[in-house]
Amino acid sequence: MNKLEKFRAVDTAFPNIGQQKLLLFSAAAAITSVPMRKGCIVANQKMLKFVNVDRDMPTKRAPDLRKQDFEEIYSEYAAVKAEEQSSRCSQCGVPYCQSHCPLHNNIPDWLRLTAEGRLREAYDVSQATNTFPEICGRICPQDRLCEGNCVIEQSGHGTVTIGSVEKYITDTAFENGWVKPISPSAERAESVGIIGAGPGGLAAADMLRRQGIQVTVYDRYDRGGGLLTYGIPGFKLEKDVVMKRMDQLEAGGIEFRLNCNVGEDLSFDAIRGKHDAVLIATGVYKTRALQAPGVGAEGVVRALDYLTASNRKSFGDDVEEFDSGALNAEGKRVVVIGGGDTAMDCVRTAIRQGATSVKCLYRRDKANMPGSQREVQNAEEEGVEFVWLSAPKGFTGDAVEGVMVQKMRLGAPDPTGRQMPELIEGSDYIEDADLVVQALGFEPEDLPKLWGVNGLEVTRWGTVKANYGTGETSLDGVYAAGDIVRGASLVVWAIRDGREAAEAIMSYLSNTASVAAE
């Protein structure tokens, strides 16, 4: 089987990858021929070393050191270690790591190439299916996706360190100048407006620009990146990583209109009238409301406000609410309410800001937390105390002094099979607190009302009603992708949605041009 047939075999196994097909064929040209077995690469002598080589993550800084700053906690692999860990891959005939990745990344291929020291080719394969591999390698919950489904993990040998190798590949590519700005082979006259500069919008912008489309991205913030920039702390994703990618996109000809609030600074209809197609990729920013007495007390804040203030300070911005102490945990007893990754971001941020104590209230137990278990472990190492099976009942003080807590127990399962928390009567107590952070998740804003647009259909949850395969909405030429369609989810899903929407938009533009030519 030749190189092109090899990539067609992968494409046949995963038919919904979308426009990445063309990129895969381009990447194939960089890879030398290898023997094939059942459509997959036959492992050579450099692979299958999981029996003799143990799983070994990059060095993690000691808790007492890392909690003093906002730098990433894991070091970079040295080349020898990256090759060694990649060689543990079993090159299985059915790669469950790939099928459980929302992007269907060609993980076994770039692990093999890394093991062989062929980093340039590994990067070509990695970026063919993933717009931001350096970001996914850092923040994806690999324990729930690729690594959690690694075959050798199931056999007790410990999963391949897929995320760390993915990060290493693209970081090396940036260091060596292999990551180039987009350079379309030909420019096209059509233009697309994208509302939202988060991962979904940026992934779509990248794909469209590669086809020569004129792309303008509109965003409410003063920097692109969305939650990558302002919602995720630097100890998980250092901001220069995001800004480096933003610089590449801008250098490739994507126009950014920042500090632009659609509905206020510019109407949705104006954007729609200016472009041949529009993509809505706003994400979800509305904090899920906590209904409890005293929730409006001073010192009870929203997670996104808290994280944004902290991230702005990391850029050197003047942040009045941080400097005044309103969104600063220094010297305070902090309680964070929630059990997802945002809650983990908040508790670990509070530790670094110098809180005297940090506690996380969650209404279920540790095994039922929706967040990454790796992040829970990191938080525990850094001194966060988890208060399991506990829920807030209310707050005391005009300026918050404490959280009224009710103990819970797990009862009968809900329709999904997950046990429902039940109140234990008479179990109330007060948890002292000077700062309470609500991290209960995010909901969509009412876009039709916010933007004054008629005909844009939404679901009963407030998300934009769109075709999951194409992102088509109820308005002609208007598409939607990411969290604004599926609800609060992972960055990797937003990237996939953005790429699929870009493919659908390309089809729409081509069909429109064909009709106009008739």
Can you say where each PLM-predicted feature lies in the sequence?
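FAD-site-proximal beta/loop scaffold in flavoenzymes
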Residues: G296-G331, P413-A488
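Beta1-alpha1 glycine-rich phosphate/pyrophosphate-binding loop at the start
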Residues: N44-S75, H104-E116, S126-Q127, Q154-G163, ...
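Conserved beta-strand-loop-beta-strand element in the redox core of flavoprotein oxidoreductases
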Residues: N261-G273, G397-D428
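FAD-binding core/adjacent interface of flavoenzyme oxidoreductases
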Residues: W110, I135-R138, D143-I195, Q211, ...
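A conserved FAD-binding loop/helix module that cradles the flavin
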Residues: C346, I484-L509
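Immediate flanking context of iron-sulfur cluster ligation sites
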Residues: E76-Y96, L119-L145
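Long hydrophobic segments that form regular secondary structure
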Residues: E330-R364, Y429-L435, F442-E443, G462, ...
